[in-house]
């Protein structure tokens, strides 16, 4: 928005973007269309400064430190001093530009504009400390996965080979600062002996097809069968993790962790 008062005082209202306000300003220029040619500009500067810049604050207009730089004909480029960069962090910026010899132009191509160069703000002390903290050991290492082993055997309703379940809490494991979802999961594992056949966890029979008598699977003749997951039936566990305290997240998949079917192998 722009307005013009007496004695060549122009008022402009700028609204810096959220992107600009959230970053560190490294340079800023105000481009203003004077309408004056080079001779008129030189003559005006010989007697007194051609342009003056003020900012409207709650305490009234305050001067903005700046310097004039190279500019195309009929334009002026005002380079804001470093001390003025914080002005671009305000959602609304009202600038008063004094140019006694300039005239207001309604042409779109003569509209003044601000140019700001920015970069990401350096992290604060707390953020630097968080980011410099050594990363946690990779939780899916063999040593950590041993935490998911089955508990000591307890008397069960039946001792035959079957699929058992255990609720795993990532908070109890101390992984809740790394794994943010799910907070827990049901860990299935195979448990029991292979002295008697079990049909509990085998695939359901197909209608019209006679059931196949149970036979323990054996990979080595004469070897003793043990209760284990059927090959090819393990499913992955999907989790959402963070390594920087919640600033970013990553979806990960742990393969072959959840048992679906058990058998004597």
UniProtKB/Swiss-Prot annotation:
Top-level taxon of origin: Eukaryota
GO biological process, alphabetically ordered: hemoglobin biosynthetic process
Cellular-component GO terms for this entry: extracellular space
Pfam families with a match to the protein in the record: TGF_beta
Protein name: Inhibin alpha chain
Propeptide: 1-131
Annotated PROSITE patterns: TGF_BETA_1, TGF_BETA_2
Family: Belongs to the TGF-beta family.
InterPro entries (UniProt xref): Cystine-knot_cytokine, TGF-b_C, TGF-beta-rel, TGFb_CS
A single MF term (Gene Ontology): growth factor activity
Subunit field text: Dimeric, linked by one or more disulfide bonds. Inhibin A is a dimer of alpha and beta-A. Inhibin B is a dimer of alpha and beta-B.
PTM: Proteolytic processing yields a number of bioactive forms, consisting either solely of the mature alpha chain, of the most N-terminal propeptide linked through a disulfide bond to the mature alpha chain, or of the entire proprotein.
Gene3D superfamilies found in the cross-reference section: Cystine-knot cytokines (2.10.90.10)
Function, as annotated: Inhibins and activins inhibit and activate, respectively, the secretion of follitropin by the pituitary gland. Inhibins/activins are involved in regulating a number of diverse functions such as hypothalamic and pituitary hormone secretion, gonadal hormone secretion, germ cell development and maturation, erythroid differentiation, insulin secretion, nerve cell survival, embryonic axial development or bone growth, depending on their subunit composition. Inhibins appear to oppose the functions of activins.
Main location: secreted
Subcellular location: Secreted
Disulfide bonds, paired cysteine numbers: 161-227, 190-262, 194-264
């Amino acid at each position: 928005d722009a307005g013009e008062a007496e004695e060549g005082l122009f008022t402009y209202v700028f609204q810096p973007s959220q992107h600009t306000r959230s970053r560190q300003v490294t340079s800023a220029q105000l481009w203003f269309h004077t309408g004056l040619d080079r001779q008129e500009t030189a003559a005006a500067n010989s007697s007194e400064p051609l342009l003056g810049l003020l900012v409207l604050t709650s305490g009234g207009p305050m001067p903005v430190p700046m310097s004039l730089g190279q500019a195309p004909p009929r334009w002026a480029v005002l380079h804001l001093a470093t001390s003025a960069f914080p002005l671009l962090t305000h959602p609304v910026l009202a600038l008063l530009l004094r140019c006694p010899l300039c005239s207001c132009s309604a042409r779109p191509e003569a509209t003044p504009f601000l140019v700001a160069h920015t970069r990401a703000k350096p992290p604060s002390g707390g953020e630097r400390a968080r980011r410099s903290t050594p990363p946690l050991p990779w939780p899916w290492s063999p040593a950590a996965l041993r935490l998911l082993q089955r508990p000591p055997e307890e008397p069960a309703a039946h001792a035959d080979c079957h699929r058992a379940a255990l609720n795993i809490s990532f908070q109890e494991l101390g992984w809740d600062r790394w794994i943010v979802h799910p907070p827990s999961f049901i860990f299935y594992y195979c448990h029991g002996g292979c002295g008697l056949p079990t049909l509990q966890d085998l695939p359901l029979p197909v209608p019209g097809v006679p059931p196949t008598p149970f036979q323990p699977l054996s990979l080595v003749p004469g070897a003793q069968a043990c209760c284990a997951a059927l090959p090819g039936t393990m499913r992955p566990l999907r989790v959402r993790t963070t390594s920087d305290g919640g600033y970013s997240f990553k979806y990960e998949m742990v393969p072959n962790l959840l048992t679906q079917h058990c058998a004597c192998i």
